[in-house]
């Protein structure tokens, strides 16, 4: 192939501009990203060589080499991994549709620390080289191809790049950065070693640099020909826990997760028995941008006997714990394990169950800690990941009780952080149920008319506003013997909390209101399944409820927003016979208008939308004149 000049994908040009102008204060990350890419390339070779050992050619020892040239003002990161063909170079470096560039660009915040973290998460770390370089040259040959099939790629990171054939004896890839003016600090072995130590010390491959000795005559260090390893080059998780410091655990997390925020907690265990494996699992402090994508790439890397197998080992962690990051290294799985085999393996099932228990144990330790700081950490975790953890209540029957104890809610007595155990401890004498209401927002829930009698009697009600709540509650019926009861479903029955005088008064009011009630039922027969007198209202004239077996208006709206069809069932209108508006109904010449407005206001009060807002406005106008 003769030299070709090709144009970058438009989004890549935008990305390059942002990288060079937005991440300057975090410029050290370029070395982390390029070493990480080199390590990945070696992992891929090791994996492909399981089925074709000839890919190793004459070099089975995998390594990453970092070098610099003061005269030429270049830094080179080279690996002897899988390498790339000419087509792969063009696809991977010129167009990066697979890397989610558009989404990456949309997520850039202008905060340099956050943006530096994102660049690795979105798989566009190669381009971080342009933070310090005004030109990058890549030379590569894919393992298994002839020496004549090497390729050179070069670009100044502007609008286009050049590609040409190259005779390259060694497989793998070298990335050479031609430094910008003012970046000479990186032309130093001490500087490069310090960056490698900070970000890449736990890369499981050796990272080599040329040795240096002090030259007394020149009063400077002189580079030697011999190469020496500058990182620990050992899998952190395989080392004894007693030899690993907290700082090393956190450094490893930052290196493999591309997350600069320290994790909330981690657990490191060697499991022996029916299945033997090592697990090193972390709870991140911040939710990823695609947390709600259940098909998102997971955070668990699978190794078998220290050999990297796959990045996204979803079968090793349930979907509701998809935010967990870490490494699982099995001694039992075959090296050629496939994703399909992972779904069926008994060993994988044992690893999944064991890992789930470890993660829940970390959460329980934080949530139940006597240390207020640890409990605050759990509160922070819940704000980031609580809604996803709720999925487990319906998906993980074996751990449902443990998950129920970890749930946290807002309530009429607290803005957040109320556990079901907290609620039970505050229940009124004679209270027989745990009461809750679902709504789109906490404010809407807090001001819902269905809460009025509960507020009057000082009964706490949980305020549920996550989209997953209704689904979760279809699987969680009780907690420690107390049923969970929606205040917007069925007839209100406060049992022993309602005295006999109140009950008799309500029955008498209902009897006196019967003629008006029948007329209301007839007027609203197309909109309401029933109309009845209620004791749940104190200040509001009316509210909507549904039968115990029907879906709530809130859930019906969520299904509609998701483009799904909801079962059609009419709500029940409950009226407060003590309210002036309801009293006006009796004998009113505008009965129909009043009845319809009463229903419309109840719809609005529960967060619903009117089918015909114009008709509502016309009725209100007629009643006002």
Curated annotation (Swiss-Prot):
GO cellular component, one term: cytoplasm
Domain of life, per lineage: Bacteria
Main location per the UniProt record: cytoplasm
Region feature B, mapped onto this chain: 340-557
GO terms assigned for molecular function: ATP binding; ATP hydrolysis activity; ATP-dependent protein folding chaperone; unfolded protein binding
Keywords from the UniProt entry: ATP-binding, Chaperone, Cytoplasm, Nucleotide-binding, Stress response
Residue ranges of the region described as C: 558-625
Record flagged with keyword ATP-binding: yes
Region entry A, spans: 1-339
Transmembrane segments annotated in the record for this chain: none
Compartments (UniProt record): Cytoplasm
Family note: Belongs to the heat shock protein 90 family.
NCBIfam families from the UniProt entry: PRK05218.1
Quaternary context: Homodimer.
Role, per record: Molecular chaperone. Has ATPase activity.
The protein's name in its UniProt record: Chaperone protein HtpG
Taxonomic lineage of the native organism: Bacteria, Pseudomonadati, Pseudomonadota, Betaproteobacteria, Burkholderiales
């Amino acid at each position: 192939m003769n030299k070709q000049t090709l144009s970058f994908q438009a989004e890549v040009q935008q990305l390059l501009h942002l990288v060079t102008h937005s991440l300057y204060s975090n410029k050290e990350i370029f070395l982390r990203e390029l070493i990480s890419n080199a390590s990945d390339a070696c992992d891929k070779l090791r994996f492909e060589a399981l089925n074709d050992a000839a890919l190793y050619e004459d070099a089975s020892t995998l390594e990453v080499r970092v070098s610099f040239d003061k005269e030429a003002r270049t830094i080179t990161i080279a690996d002897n991994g899988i390498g790339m063909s000419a087509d792969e170079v063009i696809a991977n470096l010129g167009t990066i549709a697979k890397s989610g560039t558009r989404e990456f660009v949309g997520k850039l915040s202008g905060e340099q620390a956050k943006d530096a973290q994102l660049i690795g998460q979105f798989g566009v770390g190669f381009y971080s080289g342009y933070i310090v370089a005004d030109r990058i040259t890549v030379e590569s040959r894919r393992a298994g191809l002839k020496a004549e099939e090497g390729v050179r790629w070069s670009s100044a990171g502007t609008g286009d790049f050049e590609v040409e054939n190259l005779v390259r004896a060694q497989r793998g890839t070298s990335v050479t950065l031609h430094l910008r003016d003012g970046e000479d600090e990186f032309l130093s072995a001490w500087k490069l070693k310090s960056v490698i130590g900070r970000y890449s010390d736990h890369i499981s491959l050796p990272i080599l640099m040329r040795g240096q000795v002090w030259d007394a005559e020149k009063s400077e260090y002189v580079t030697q020909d011999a190469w020496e390893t500058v990182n620990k080059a050992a899998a952190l998780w395989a080392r004894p826990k007693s030899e690993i410091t907290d700082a090393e655990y956190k450094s490893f997390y930052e290196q493999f997760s591309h997350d600069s925020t320290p994790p909330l907690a981690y657990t490191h265990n060697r499991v022996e028995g029916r299945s033997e494996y090592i697990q090193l699992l972390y709870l991140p402090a911040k939710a990823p941008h695609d947390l709600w994508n259940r098909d998102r790439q997971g955070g668990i890397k699978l190794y078998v006997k220290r050999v990297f197998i796959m990045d996204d080992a979803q079968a090793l962690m349930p979907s509701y714990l998809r935010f967990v990051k870490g490494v699982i290294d099995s001694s039992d799985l075959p090296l050629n394990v496939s994703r399909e085999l992972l779904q069926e393996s008994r060993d994988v099932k044992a690893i999944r169950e064991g890992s789930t228990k470890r993660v829940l144990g970390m959460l329980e330790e934080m949530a139940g800690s006597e240390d207020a700081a640890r409990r605050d950490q759990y509160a922070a975790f819940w704000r980031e990941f609580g809604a996803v953890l709720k999925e487990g209540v319906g998906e993980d029957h074996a751990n449902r009780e443990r998950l129920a104890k970890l749930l946290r809610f807002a309530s009429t007595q607290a803005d957040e952080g109320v556990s079901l155990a907290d609620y039970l401890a505050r229940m009124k004498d004679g209270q027989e149920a745990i009461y809750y209401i679902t709504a789109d927002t906490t404010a809407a829930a807090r001001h819902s008319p269905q809460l009025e009698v509960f507020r009057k009697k000082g009964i706490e009600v949980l305020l549920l506003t996550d989209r997953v709540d209704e689904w979760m509650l279809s699987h969680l019926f009780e907690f420690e013997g107390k049923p969970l009861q929606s205040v917007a479903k069925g007839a209100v029955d406060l049992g022993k909390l309602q005295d006999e005088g109140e009950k008799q008064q309500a029955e008498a009011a209902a009897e006196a209101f019967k003629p008006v009630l029948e007329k209301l039922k007839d007027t609203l027969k197309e909109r309401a399944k029933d109309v009845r007198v209620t004791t749940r209202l104190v200040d509001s004239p009316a509210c909507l409820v549904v039968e115990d077996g029907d879906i709530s208006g809130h859930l019906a709206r969520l299904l509609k927003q998701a483009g799904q069809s909801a079962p059609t069932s009419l709500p029940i209108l409950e009226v407060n016979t003590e309210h002036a508006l309801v009293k006006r109904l009796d004998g009113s010449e505008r009965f129909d208008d009043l009845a319809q407005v009463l229903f419309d206001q109840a719809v609005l009060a529960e967060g619903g939308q009117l089918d015909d807002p114009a008709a509502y406005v016309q009725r209100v106008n007629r009643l006002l004149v």
